């Protein structure tokens, strides 16, 4: 049924007053309405009070829509959009004000995640060369990014790493044991890998692999080995250490199921990680045999590296290290080291570690 004009009541309505929603059929009826009802015809004032009776009367016949409610909803949506636009404009303006002017500015510290998603591939992430290691940086806020405390230690005058340990227990027939994951911090690049293993990880190794000559394996006794004793036990244990390998010089977010064995007795941590790729910080797999590794992982006995890119990348890394050393002499690019009460150069305990399994990267695809 056609709705008639609310003024003359003869013709079908064509217009609706923006303020009071009275329906009119012509300009003449619209003017009569404004004079009779003292209506300005302008959009409502959002601060104006609307009584509950008027709100109920604005319902349609089926009580499915309400003009006042719809009007307030549109107003709030528009207000939210306006605030969002102003916030983004202010953020972009701050970037232009704080950004370097006229080329490189050595005093300007570039933000870690100041890259718009529209300007790059969604699978591409920021890359930082740290001590010759290709570090893929995850978006800020992800758990693995928050756990990363790798930085230049000004007190010790060397680089310290965060390392994720994944212990693979010996698998027995009919029994499947869970992996043990732990993140250790402040591991010096000049140490051997086994020297960076703290008490918590060492005690778990004793439990998983029944290491001989340790008090942790004796029932009722807590581990009381010193750092030197733990290092000797691990070196004689026959444990194998692996790390993930990625496509050479990659910049795309991905996970890898391919591992390479590390020569822990020949090189220090800095030399082991050089010319490799890690996601935020290194992940080290520990197992007694290759068969104990998680299902789906493959060990490469020789890490594949394209020879045509080796010399170019090595030259690039050497230049990056020279620039990094020059910046460290003047103003370190890593976050400053906070003062600690304990000796940072010899920390046997894992009090500074995150006893947290960390972020699993299995959901990423190669």
UniProtKB/Swiss-Prot annotation:
Present with 2800 molecules/cell in log phase SD medium. The modification Phosphoserine is found at residue 330. Belongs to the BCD1 family. One of its GO terms (biological process) is snoRNA localization. One of its GO terms (cellular component) is cytoplasm. Its main location: nucleus. It is found in: Nucleus. Residues 321-332, 343-355 have a biased composition (Acidic residues). This is Box C/D snoRNA protein 1. SUPFAM superfamilies: HIT/MYND zinc finger-like. A zinc finger (HIT-type) spans 5-39. Zn(2+) 2 binds at residues 17, 20, 33, 39. CDD domains: zf-HIT_BCD1. Zn(2+) 1 binds at residues 5, 8, 25, 29. Residues 318-366 are annotated as: Disordered. Disulfide bonds: none annotated. Required for box C/D snoRNAs accumulation involved in snoRNA processing, snoRNA transport to the nucleolus and ribosome biogenesis. Keywords: Metal-binding, Nucleus, Phosphoprotein, Ribosome biogenesis, Zinc, Zinc-finger.
């Amino acid at each position: 049924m056609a709705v008639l004009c609310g003024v003359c009541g003869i013709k079908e309505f064509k217009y609706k007053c923006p303020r009071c929603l009275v329906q009119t059929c012509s300009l003449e009826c619209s003017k009569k309405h404004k004079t009779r009802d003292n209506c300005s015809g302008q959009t409502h004032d959002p601060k104006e009070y609307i009584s509950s009776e008027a709100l109920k009367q604005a319902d349609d016949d089926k009580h499915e829509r309400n003009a006042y409610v719809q009007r307030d909803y549109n107003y709030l949506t528009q207000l939210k959009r306006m605030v969002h636009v102003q916030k983004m404009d202010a953020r972009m303006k701050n970037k232009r004000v704080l950004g370097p002017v006229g080329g490189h500015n050595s005093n300007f510290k570039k933000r870690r995640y100041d890259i718009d998603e529209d300007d790059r591939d969604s699978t591409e992430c920021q890359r930082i060369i740290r001590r010759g290691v290709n570090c893929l940086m995850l978006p800020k806020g992800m758990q693995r990014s928050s756990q990363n405390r790798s930085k230049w230690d000004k007190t010790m005058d060397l680089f310290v790493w965060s390392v994720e340990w994944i212990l693979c227990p010996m698998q027995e027939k009919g029994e499947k044991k869970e992996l043990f994951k732990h993140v250790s911090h402040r591991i010096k690049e000049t140490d051997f890998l086994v020297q960076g293993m703290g008490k918590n990880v060492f005690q778990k190794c004793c439990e998983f692999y029944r290491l001989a000559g340790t008090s942790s394996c004796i029932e009722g006794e807590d581990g009381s080995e010193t750092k030197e004793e733990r290092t000797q036990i691990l070196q004689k244990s026959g444990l194998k250490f692996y790390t993930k390998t990625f496509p050479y010089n990659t910049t795309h977010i991905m996970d890898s199921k391919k591992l390479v064995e590390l020569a822990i007795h020949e090189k220090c941590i800095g030399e082991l990680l050089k010319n490799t790729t890690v996601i935020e910080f290194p992940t080290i797999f520990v197992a007694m045999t290759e068969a104990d590794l998680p299902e789906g992982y493959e060990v490469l006995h020789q890490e594949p590296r394209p020879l045509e890119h080796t010399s170019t990348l090595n030259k690039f890394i050497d230049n990056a290290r020279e620039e990094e050393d020059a910046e460290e002499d003047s103003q370190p690019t890593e976050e400053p080291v906070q003062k600690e009460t304990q000796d940072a150069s010899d920390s046997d305990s894992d009090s500074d570690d995150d006893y947290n399994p960390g972020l699993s990267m299995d959901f990423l695809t190669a």
